């Protein structure tokens, strides 16, 4: 990226697609950027949201499988480890800022809630719930930014745009 920012793709709502589709998208997207699968917590309590232990799949048929669901988040530990590795490798005395960028209703606020293990960002099932950007301190080294959904115009992300072109448009929107 032109500003030296690192991009990591989070394939959210992984529990809503068949295993074969998720694995194919993970393989494809990892050619461009580090990509991690994720499922946000759907627990109702406000604090101490639990995290699943690993990315496991439950066989449904002989040819395909579906996500072994539950209310806990899955993929959180891997994302936290990646963020902490980036933070440690930069060897900074201050915190790093991790922004969430995506279309409306893709789970940016839910991702932050799952990482923080607390309901720090308001969420709703309707698109456009997050109106302004807000910063959340994950710990003393990492600050998370929750952002409103970005809707790309045809000029910014034409059909068939590469991941690099979409990332550049998203970066421009965050400036």
Please describe what each predicted stretch is:
Residues 2-3, 27-30, 90-94, 103-105, ...:
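Intrinsically disordered, low-complexity regulatory regions enriched in Ser/Pro/Gly/Thr
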């Amino acid at each position: 990226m032109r500003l030296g920012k690192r991009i990591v793709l989070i394939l959210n709502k992984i529990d809503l697609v068949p295993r074969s589709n998720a694995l194919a998208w993970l393989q494809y997207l990892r050619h461009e950027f580090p990509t991690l699968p994720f499922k946000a917590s759907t627990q109702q309590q406000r604090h101490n949201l639990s995290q699943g232990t690993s990315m496991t799949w439950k066989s449904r048929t002989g040819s395909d499988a579906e996500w072994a669901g539950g209310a806990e988040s899955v993929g959180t530990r891997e994302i936290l480890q990646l963020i902490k590795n980036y933070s440690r490798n930069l060897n900074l005395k201050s915190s790093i800022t991790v922004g969430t960028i995506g279309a409306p209703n893709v789970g940016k606020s839910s991702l932050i809630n799952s990482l923080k293990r607390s309901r720090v960002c308001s969420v709703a099932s309707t698109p456009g719930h997050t109106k302004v950007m807000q910063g959340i301190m994950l710990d003393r080294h990492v600050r998370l930014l929750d952002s409103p959904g970005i809707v790309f115009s045809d000029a910014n992300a034409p059909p068939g745009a590469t991941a690099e072109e979409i990332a550049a448009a998203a970066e421009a929107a965050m400036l």
